[in-house]
């Protein structure tokens, strides 16, 4: 591979762009130890991929990060609007975002309560990213939570040798537009650098009325010294999207009505045209201060403080409502519109210290985060005036969550072998109390303590091939909906997984092969039951024993400097063992449980929902202007 560089590529629209001044970025940055402390490298035994964002800039047309990286092994994508703009979701080995840990510059991005990753809240982050690492399986420790399906690490602290000003615009189907303006001073003689970006993205979407209006800005004020770097980063995203998360019925799908959107009709109960303001409206602000030090003895330290602020709502039309559910003393029935709000803050600090010698390195790290959020609802309009006085908030509950994580990662190099011992301890407290939309009162206060040990070994056979193995244990706590869903049969339990990985990598002059075999044995895995909650999200339930096992393969081949081929394959078995499903029957007269008519179904082995057994990807790339 000495004369050939493989670049991932998928078919895209043509991008129109203009660059007033451009330059090559530095690839060696002093003191980026906060990234080194949480990422895997060539010494570590993990199944991972790294994408330099400059390799995919020709595809950066406004779509979310899941769309841009979906070609990696074992990844799936779904998107509400149908074109990758707006709400998009990523799955790794069949596991959704609630099991994927996402960090931006070492700062956890997953929502603290739902563990979801809302890419729509950070539109065009890809334009500010330097690289993205995707790690499959539980992997080694990171700041904050631990992923079960995988982890994604995004680095935006980019050093520019020269100043530049760049404007990019693109347009395409469904009235899609993207405009991005970026500028940087480059590193000035005194070591200062200011980098900024502003973006605007809009699209009408493939699905009916699934329009998106997305805006964001990014600012990084940096100082590069002889033995330190400092970054103050401020970013903000705003999204306004028409709701399109209700899905498509099998009947409509078979009829060919793939663009149908029932949002704004209250599942067909509203007469006339769909409600025009059935929107999701959310703002999110991120502040990060990152300080890195390189001491004279070669040791490295980092300190990061951060704050994430979120505020917004989604609005919907509800038909034939009992007004008593919208405030004590209200009476009557009729249609209304309401807004369901989320107002939250996340504060945190990360610290790490790394000692590196000729044959070993040791990284010790600790992180702490504190989350507080309010959930409340407001009635916008009663189309039939109720009897009584409406409340300003017809439900209100708050939540608090603390997460304390500490880990120590020891790497020892002996001849051709490299050993990694990673020990992580997490302590989580999650509490919430108040009223729900149905006026019921609830409260819970849960504490979790997790010990997550991991062991890795890699063996370098020669300069172009290596073998690695990984064995680890990890846990992840239940999320908000697991505690609150009305159909939950019992209090949810944390998930626990044992993960084994075996891999082989080989390079030739014009090609490269990667093979990875994995086995993941779960205790109390939370899996979808097939039911949905009041907002259409899948209801999850613990299953005692289950597993995910399979193989991943990647192959690159370079025919010439201009023509290359890339493919990957994912094959897996995803099964639940000894599963009991309870079908509860109700009496029509009073909806009480009919015990005699209820039944229990026992499964010795059944598939896990949303978990494919085969994912395949292939591409042939021709670059006529390559040298």
Task: Locate each region found by the language model.
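Short strand-turn segments of transmembrane beta-barrel domains in outer membranes
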Residues: 138-141, 150-187, 198-208, 399
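Structural signature of Gram-negative outer-membrane beta-barrels, strongest in the C-terminal barrel
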Residues: 359-361, 367-369, 390, 394-522, ...
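Surface-exposed extracellular loop regions of Gram-negative outer-membrane beta-barrel proteins
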Residues: 180-218, 313-337, 343, 376-380, ...
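Acidic/polar loop-and-plug regions of large Gram-negative outer-membrane beta-barrel proteins
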Residues: 222, 229-288, 315-336
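N-terminal periplasmic "start-of-domain" segments of outer-membrane beta-barrel proteins
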Residues: 31-62, 89
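Extracytoplasmic beta-strand/coil segments of soluble accessory domains associated
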Residues: 66-108, 130
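Short acidic/polar hinge/loop motifs at secondary-structure boundaries
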Residues: 108-136, 155, 252
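Gram-negative outer-membrane beta-barrel transporters
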Residues: 415, 519-521, 541-627
